[in-house]
Amino acid sequence: MVLDKILRAGEGRILRKLKAIAEQVNLIEDDFTGLSDGELRGMTDEFRQRLADGKETLDDLLPEAFAAVREAARRTLGQRHFDVQIMGGAALHLGNIAEMKTGEGKTLVSTLPTYLNALAGKGVHVITVNDYLAQRDAENMGRVHRFLGLTVGVIHPQMPPPVRRAQYACDITYGTNNEFGFDYLRDNMAWSSEELVQRGHNFAVVDEVDSILIDEARTPLIISGPADHPTRWYTEFARIAPLLERDVDYEVEEGKRTVAITESGVEKVEDQLGIENLYESVNTPLVGYLNNSLKAKELYKRDKDYIVTDGEVLIVDEFTGRVLHGRRYSEGMHQAIEAKEKVEIKQENQTLATITLQNYFRLYDKLSGMTGTAMTEAAEFHQIYSLGVVPIPTNKPMVRLDQPDVVYKTEIAKFDAVVEDIAERHEKGQPVLVGTTSVEKSEYLSKQLRKRGVPHEVLNAKHHEREAAIIAEAGRKGAVTVATNMAGRGTDIMLGGNPEFIAQAELRQRGLSPIETPEDYEAAWQEALEKARQSVKAEHEEVVDAGGLYVLGTERHESRRIDNQLRGRAGRQGDRGESRFYLSLGDDLMRLFNAAAVEGIMDRLNIPEDVPIESKIVTRAIRSAQTQVEGQNFEIRKNVLKYDEVMNKQRTVIYEERRKVLGGADLHEQVRHFVDDTVEGYVRGATADGYPEEWDLDTLWTALGQLYPVGVVAPDVDDRDGLTADHLLEDIQVDAQEAYDRRELDLGDGPDSEPIMRELERRVVLAVLDRKWREHLYEMDYLQEGIGLRAMGQRDPLVEYQREGFDMFQTMMEGIKEESVRLLFNVEVQVAGQEEAATSVGVEPAVSAAPAPPAAAATLPAPAVPTIPDGAGPVADAQPVRPAAARQTPPPPSPVPSAPLPVFVKGLEPRRPTGGLRYTAPSVDGGSGPVTTVDGRSGLGRPAGDGALSAARGEAGTAQPGAGTRPARNAPCPCGSGRKYKRCHGDPARRNTE
């Protein structure tokens, strides 16, 4: 509260500054009104030239630029920016969040700062909440920008990279937060500079900024590749979960969305599985399957959190009510739901690239946003994004009547009252917008309305294709619209009908488009708009007389902002309107907290079920519940950010290194340092004991022989008098550098050798960098999963995560150096037009990318080389599914960028994606986010057979690691536990105790 007061202390001063800017624009408005279309368009070139001369800044140009946009909007859209919209545009340009009430024209406001900042030529991004709004705004608001000579682009999920790159090259680019974020991650997985699509992060305007930066910030963006195939455990635990009784065998805390198994439940599970101890180390993975199956049973409800269509589980976004097509929960949650619903269980995934929305948006040099509900989260915007919130006055006074909540004892009684209220309003011609919290409840209410004979439209996740059309008609006389939360954002509800929507629909029917036929579209626009305005004018007056739009909420949301967004649909631009919430003690929000106490009071007072109550106790309980949930969610978002700060610093280092390589940087000196550092690590490790007679020189020579063709004769060095570690290091470093010179000469003939080696360095370093980074992400995921347990040992989990994460990053960087050096000395290279050069490759690089040692060391045992987690590489690594034994060989490293030189590195040639990448984006709760599948084809993985099930049951024939060939560290453990070998029987600590 104190911080809120501090943040609001300067509001009056800021508003006075914004009002002064609006007055400046008004003073010069007539100067622009008198310009011809060509002269007005020519102002863009003049502004750019004045910027290029360096004598004026964007702030200096603001009044004139805003006046130009205001006039262009009047000529193209038939809309003139109000003074409060000019104020909002100035607030956005200055890097603030403009809080503007629903119906105040936020979309039109965005044209002002986007035009001004696009003059700098660095690109402007406009971020919306869904693809429909991005396409719509790019077309409609793009008319203003195109009229002024700017280019406008829009990105959507299925757009190919060349087209996507062209859209980013435009002056202004529209798209969703997920698309912008995933493009950033994909750019940092690119194989060549030609594949990059984004051109920097200059200025962004985020529409519905609270939804994107607050509601959706609990889940990071993740690109993942195929991991293991699903096992039978999902089906097994889907069978067991219904046998367990809530509050007896397990406990549920809905507020935190957690489940906890009790001793009774553990005994029942052990009995069902036929095992002695569920928490024995070999059975540890089963606990995760059990928890997910119980969450699927209790916390994920069909037709609320997801729907099942054509044998597929589709997530429903809690905040918008939309179906998130192709998206999936991560960490096995989606598979557990699929098993519960008895549909096909699809495979899990492993992280390849990730970033939180908080850290993505902090990449922008300047960030701004607009929404109707931001002041309640002003402190969070300030703390995390350094954004101020400026409440912009409404153009006309708000006259909406917000009625007090009414509370019923049961949900059935509540809906009966809702139907009666709707029927009465409909009979007198008042339009009604009903907000529900789930698909299930919207369809239940629709069924009740049909019984009552009330005509209505239903807008929920199953009918989102008609969203815009339904909402545009929701303000018509007597209209009744039942909608999930998706109705709250993006499309304006105008009393009597939306003339702009009607005009656009008419022009579309005539085959006109603002993109494809801009001249014909603009010529026909004014006539179509005026015709539509006349058609709705009379009806508008009738609806106003009936009381305006009536917004009826059937349940309170966890967040006050979501409730305010629903209320805000009524009373736009000074129109009459009314709102009311109907509640019951069975509502989700009430059940999360102490609704039982209120129910007890109603029972003692003998209040009938169909009689509502209006009590300060209930009002306080609701307010308290919402405040608690908002506080919990804020802590979740802060916690996500704290942990991602560790990854963000590491990600910045890796991505900067990749960009340097993609940019064609000369890595020669850096690779030379790699050679020296790797050799030094070998020598220091072998000579750590101090005295020469205690040095492990045999191991040193073996390791060096596997690294590069050693020229130093070992006996000569071993027998030297007065040998020191420093002398030994110097001799070997000189020898390694000379070997590198010879390697460069061997790869080319004369002047061609150097460019070939430089290209090889870039390819190898990029391939190793990508592989090691993927492995590191896997390790960091594993670390974060269990780091919370450190609190039991009185240690701060975050501090432990920071410390261990740094150590792991240092280890990864050393591994990048070592593997790069090994590959540069040993990998097979072929230049177009030459015979294939067989340069000391004893194993198949195309499979492992870990070459055998040179011939001189061919008989020495190969050192362990870190491998990619089984099936975890990008889709470019995907191969036809092979038997499990064959798949224990790790896949090849990431493809690397193509280059001007026709150089081919066996096992490292770039290949195009074949499918399998998945994208995790913000979802319905603070837990696992959904994953978007671009190509649904299966990737590599290990099918779970009967051996896996019998292993946990303790039956005869349980697979155990044998004494033969050891699996790769990241391959599935042969015991059938479902864990990686290195985390199961490959764990040295475990082997030592068995």
Curated annotation (Swiss-Prot):
Binding site for Zn(2+): C973, C975, C984, H985
GO molecular function ontology, one term from the record: protein-exporting ATPase activity
Biased composition regions of type Basic and acidic residues, renumbered to the chain: 984-994
GO biological process, one term: protein import
Cofactors required: Zn(2+)
Biased composition (Pro residues): 889-900
Catalytic activity: ATP + H2O + cellular proteinSide 1 = ADP + phosphate + cellular proteinSide 2
Gene3D superfamilies tied to this protein: 3.10.450.50, Helical scaffold and wing domains of SecA, P-loop containing nucleotide triphosphate hydrolases, SecA, preprotein cross-linking domain
SMART domains, sorted: SecA_DEAD, SecA_PP_bind
InterPro entries, sorted: Helicase_ATP-bd, Helicase_C-like, P-loop_NTPase, SEC_C_motif, SecA, SecA_CS, SecA_DEAD, SecA_motor_DEAD
NCBIfam families: PRK12904.1, secA
Protein name: Protein translocase subunit SecA
Organism: Frankia casuarinae (strain DSM 45818 / CECT 9043 / HFP020203 / CcI3)
